[in-house]
């Protein structure tokens, strides 16, 4: 009788240990580098948008972006991935006039690759978006804050 309870207890303990096993250090290091790259790309885009020489900023601010209600986990990166196409279109407006945003397509492409590495190929996560939309600067700032938060937990 006690043997069955002991085996059940051991099985439960093994499941708990397996589910809470830490990521290997090389995997953590790679994730840190990918998060840092994503953070740098977002900051670069924000700097280009906020550049005082950007004649299209007022026009860019009229476009609205969706942000998740609460972005706290890697699965929320799916929400960013879903908005990247819209971001690329808006950032493409001033390309001919704004030196700081000339490599938009390459940056967005790099971000897509980085996001795929970070979140994996799993796309079944459905984003719950905030009721209010965000301007391009609010959108970028929110994702920068998210990346900084995740990055700080990794280091």
Curated annotation (Swiss-Prot):
Keyword line: Adaptive immunity, Cytokine, Disulfide bond, Glycoprotein, Growth factor, Immunity, Secreted, Signal
GO BP: activated T cell proliferation; adaptive immune response; cell surface receptor signaling pathway via STAT; extrinsic apoptotic signaling pathway in absence of ligand; interleukin-2-mediated signaling pathway; leukocyte activation involved in immune response; negative regulation of B cell apoptotic process; negative regulation of inflammatory response
Principal location class: secreted
Pfam families in alphabetical order: IL2
Claim: ATP-binding is one of the keywords in the record: no
Any single GO CC term annotated in Swiss-Prot or TrEMBL for this entry: extracellular space
Glycan-carrying positions: 24, 112
Job description of the protein: Cytokine produced by activated CD4-positive helper T-cells and to a lesser extend activated CD8-positive T-cells and natural killer (NK) cells that plays pivotal roles in the immune response and tolerance. Binds to a receptor complex composed of either the high-affinity trimeric IL-2R (IL2RA/CD25, IL2RB/CD122 and IL2RG/CD132) or the low-affinity dimeric IL-2R (IL2RB and IL2RG). Interaction with the receptor leads to oligomerization and conformation changes in the IL-2R subunits resulting in downstream signaling starting with phosphorylation of JAK1 and JAK3.
Protein name as it appears in the record: Interleukin-2
Organism from which the protein derives: Vulpes vulpes
Gene name linked to the record: IL2
